[in-house]
From Swiss-Prot:
Species, as recorded: Lactococcus lactis subsp. cremoris (strain SK11)
Protein family: Belongs to the thymidylate synthase family. Bacterial-type ThyA subfamily.
Name of the coding gene: thyA
Cellular component per GO, a single term: cytosol
Annotated catalytic residues: 153 (nucleophile)
Descriptive protein name: Thymidylate synthase
Keywords, ordered alphabetically: Cytoplasm, Methyltransferase, Nucleotide biosynthesis, Transferase
Catalytic activity: dUMP + (6R)-5,10-methylene-5,6,7,8-tetrahydrofolate = 7,8-dihydrofolate + dTMP
EC number: 2.1.1.45
Main location as per UniProt: cytoplasm
Length: 279
């Protein structure tokens, strides 16, 4: 069993055994019912990417390619226009959060563009990678007041470098997430930001180091317990999947494409499970 599968099962068991139920939840299911969840707070895990510890479970298929396309919509295209996500990348699951003007509001990619977040990050890392201020922050109250829309879940990422004994510079990343759907989105979000970490490392010809993942509220929705128990019963694949970015060192961040990523040795357990999303 991979490290990621161990973490996946431990998190599920922890929520089932020690979690508490939310009250007066904001999200709703498609039938209009309130979508409460069982949750724990303060979940933290470290993945040593240098050692091949990638945060992807093999207990069910995870749509990594779509996740990476969504990431590029946010950080390369820098827009919240759903037409770009749907027509350029063929990713359609954000439609439920459309606010009426064809966007998801002044959120995510629109915030990245408004504050030139990626430009400032790359400039800061180029000037002084050892500076402890290389941060992405999508939690902008001004944007929340400007339009309606879902508030960012994965909202802050911090980057640090280390020069190891081999003389190479390694890029570490820390993702902070306010809320995470353990069964549906946990490994999607983690792998998205590992991909972002890899893109930035390639831009500077650095190695990829460690990925630190903190979730403030880690939950299982109250209509997902059957799926949770099924996942706990499954035997994980013996393969150890890893994500590879097949571009030369020094490739510009904005020149990297979704097809440059390759998920190697990924043989997830099937069949896929179905989930009714909370909106």
């Amino acid at each position: 069993m991979t490290y990621a599968d161990q973490v996946f099962k431990q998190n599920i068991q922890n929520i089932l055994d020690n979690g508490v139920f939310s009250e007066n939840a904001r999200p709703k299911y498609k039938d209009g019912q309130m979508a409460n969840s069982k949750y724990v707070t303060g979940s933290f895990v470290t993945y040593d990417l240098q050692k091949g510890e990638f945060p992807i479970t093999t207990l069910r298929p995870i749509p990594i390619k779509s996740a990476i396309k969504e990431l590029m919509w946010i950080y390369q295209d820098q827009t919240s226009e759903l037409s770009v996500l749907e027509e350029k990348y063929g990713v359609k699951y954000w439609g439920e959060w459309r606010i009426g003007d064809g966007t998801i509001g002044q959120r995510y990619g629109a915030t990245v563009k408004k504050y030139n977040i990626i430009g400032k990050l790359l400039e800061g890392l180029a000037k002084n990678p050892w500076n402890r201020r290389n941060i992405i922050n999508l939690w902008q109250y001004e944007d929340f007041e400007e339009t309606e829309g879902l508030l960012p879940c994965a909202f802050q990422t911090m980057f640090d470098v280390r020069r190891e004994k081999d003389g190479q510079i390694y890029l570490d990343a820390t993702l902070i997430q306010r809320s995470n759907d353990m069964l549906v989105a946990h490994h999607i979000n983690a792998m998205q930001y590992v991909a972002l970490q890899m893109m930035i490392a390639k831009h500077f010809s650095w190695k990829v180091g460690k990925f630190f993942y903190f979730v403030n509220n880690l939950h299982i929705y109250d209509n997902q317990f059957e799926q949770a128990n099924e996942l706990m019963k499954r035997t994980a694949s013996e393969k150890e999947p890893r994500l590879v970015l097949n571009v030369p060192d020094g490739t510009n961040f904005f020149d990297i494409k979704p097809e440059d990523f390759e998920l190697v040795d990924y043989e997830p357990v099937k069949p896929q499970l179905k989930f009714d999303l909370a909106i």
